[in-house]
Amino acid sequence: MIFVIRPPVSGNGRDTMTVDANDETRDQQLPLPPRPVLPDMAAARSRGPADVVEAHWQSLRLSWQWRHAVHKIRSPGRPYPGIVPLLDAAAAQPRLRRLYPLTSHFALLFSSSTGYPWSVQAGSIEPLYNGRFKVRRRSPYAVIGEVETAEEAVALVLELLPTGPEAVITASADDHV
């Protein structure tokens, strides 16, 4: 059995290679970076919602950094949405850092609740494959803008946060069990 594999075009004129399915090297995989050691979420829950928020920020950043590193090994040259620089830029902002971060389909959202049902604050930021970032307002739902950098996107979301007293972080029902 013969398979044709089409790796990303390297520019040297070779855009396909043929691999024999019986070749012993077909089962060899490229070495991947070790999985990160994530924070102990159960211990964080026992200390309260603020610790859950901090542990989840750390967990998200480590997890997405690892996924990005794996992507670079498995799919060299293919674009990867800018979720890692987005998480770094958002984590650098104290007003966002105190909210529970969550991701869905690469989009970053911020909740004042540490569990479902989420209480999403402000809006969301979606890293695009072209390297830009799309910012959406939550209510009423609307695209606020598309910007070049993660820092610009974070600045737009900060403008969407309510003024006045900071949102109170609440634990999910599961955290009280």
PLM segments and residue spans:
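Membrane-targeting and insertion segments and their boundary/processing signals
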Residues: 124-127, 171, 175
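Aromatic/pi-system hotspot detector in well-structured domains
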Residues: 90, 123, 147
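N-terminal amphipathic/basic-hydrophobic helices that include classical n-h-c signal peptides
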Residues: 1-15
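Short aromatic-glycine-(Arg/Gly/Cys) micro-motifs in beta-strand/loop hairpins
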Residues: 3, 7, 115-141
